[in-house]
């Protein structure tokens, strides 16, 4: 390693160091939280390598199965879930996982553990074969029922405002980890030369306004009229449209630079497409801790009580001023 790079790495806290320091500053954070976040970060390194290897082996292929949301699964969706399940079980802090790629709750062998993780193992996996960004989303809940008993619906069907922490990994030109607790939002960048994440974006705050919006324009004619009116407003304001097809990537841009992401209901999907528990709650928690807003058009995302773990909702998230302007169009 060049000497200058070594000096830089030594002067910036690693994820491990920062989690320890944050635990010391805020003793109310359960000791399990940094352990779980560290396990997610470790798994992300392996997943990044698996994605690269799949490209080299030209094995970016789909399975013959659909997940519960009706999306065709790629092999890497299943591989990623396996990595995370193994890592989370090894923490001894997680009793169960709910995943976009699993039909129902996945119990782990840690019967005495008090925490449940909601997980989207590989967001935007259809982007892999064209080398576009992909991501992972996760959040942490505390179970309600007693330890050593089967997981109950009440343990998982709870509003997102009860999340203890939430985060995502973005696999792109550099690999990034962002996580949030009630004490703030922080971003880390992966340095492959030392195999660690380093704090590069401390105490993130989402700008109150922005100049970009993200929406799939190909469905514009199927959106409700109020969304069509809002898009017309964005165009009159000469806002820039940026849409990658990977939720994590689009949100990350808006977290850093300001903007709004929209996934409205359509004729074919009147209840929306994005999963409340695996995608919307995760990013809504991060956005609100960073000063942004997230809504389904009627109520804050974090207030919604899920009916089932794979529930879908309309989703609007981003800079506070832009989301409020959208809600004015909804009326």
Curated annotation (Swiss-Prot):
> What do we know about how this protein assembles, alone or with others?
Homotetramer.
Origin organism is Amoebophilus asiaticus (strain 5a2)
What is written in the cofactor note of this entry? Binds 2 magnesium ions per subunit.
Q: Which family does it belong to?
A: Belongs to the FBPase class 1 family.
Q: What is the lineage of its organism?
A: Bacteria, Pseudomonadati, Bacteroidota, Cytophagia, Cytophagales
Disulphide bonds annotated for this chain are none
Please name the GO terms that the record assigns under molecular function. Answer: fructose 1,6-bisphosphate 1-phosphatase activity; magnesium ion binding
Catalytic reaction list: beta-D-fructose 1,6-bisphosphate + H2O = beta-D-fructose 6-phosphate + phosphate
Quote the record's binding site residues for Mg(2+) 2. Answer: 120, 123, 279
Question: Keywords assigned by UniProt?
Answer: Carbohydrate metabolism, Cytoplasm, Hydrolase, Magnesium, Metal-binding
* Keyword Transport among UniProt keywords: no
Uppermost EC category: hydrolase
Localization (cell): Cytoplasm
Gene Ontology BP, a term: gluconeogenesis
Q: In which pathway does it act?
A: Carbohydrate biosynthesis; gluconeogenesis
Give the protein name, as stated in the record: Fructose-1,6-bisphosphatase class 1
Q: What is its EC number?
A: 3.1.3.11
Q: Identify the cofactor(s).
A: Mg(2+)
- The residues listed in the UniProt record as binding Mg(2+) 1, with positions renumbered to this chain, are 100, 120, 122
Give binding positions for substrate: 123-126, 216, 243, 261-263, 273
Instruction: Note the superkingdom of the native organism.
Output: Bacteria
Give the transmembrane ranges: none
- NCBIfam families on file: PRK09293.1-1
């Amino acid at each position: 390693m060049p000497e200058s790079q070594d000096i830089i790495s030594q002067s910036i806290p690693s994820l491990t160091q920062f989690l320890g320091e944050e635990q010391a500053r805020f003793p109310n954070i359960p000791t399990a939280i940094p352990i779980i976040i560290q396990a997610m970060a470790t798994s992300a390194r392996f997943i990044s390598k698996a994605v690269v290897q799949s490209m080299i082996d030209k094995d970016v292929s789909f399975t013959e199965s659909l997940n519960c949301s009706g999306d065709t699964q790629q092999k890497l969706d299943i591989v990623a879930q396996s990595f995370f399940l193994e890592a989370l079980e090894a923490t001894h802090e997680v009793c169960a996982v709910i995943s976009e790629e699993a039909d129902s709750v996945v119990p782990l062998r840690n019967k005495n553990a008090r925490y449940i993780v909601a997980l989207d193992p590989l967001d935007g996996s259809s982007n892999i074969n064209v080398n576009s960004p992909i991501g992972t989303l996760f959040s942490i809940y505390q179970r309600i029922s007693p330890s050593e008993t089967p997981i109950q619906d009440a343990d998982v069907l709870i509003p997102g405002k009860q999340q203890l922490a939430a985060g995502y990994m973005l696999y792109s030109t550099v690999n990034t980890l962002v996580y949030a607790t009630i004490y703030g939002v922080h971003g880390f960048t992966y340095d492959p030369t030392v195999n660690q994440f380093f704090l590069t974006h401390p105490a993130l705050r989402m700008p109150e306004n922005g100049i970009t919006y993200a929406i799939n324009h190909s469905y514009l004619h199927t959106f409700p009229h109020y969304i069509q009116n809002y898009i017309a407003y964005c165009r009159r304001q000469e806002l820039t449209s940026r849409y990658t097809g990977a939720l994590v990537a689009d949100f990350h841009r808006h977290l850093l630079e300001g903007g709004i992401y929209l996934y409205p209901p359509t004729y074919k999907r009147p209840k929306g497409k994005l999963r409340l528990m695996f995608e919307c709650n995760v990013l809504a928690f991060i956005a609100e801790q960073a000063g942004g807003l997230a809504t389904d058009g009627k109520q804050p995302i974090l207030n919604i009580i899920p009916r089932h773990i794979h529930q879908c909702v309309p989703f609007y998230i981003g800079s506070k001023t832009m989301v409020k302007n959208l809600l004015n169009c909804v009326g």
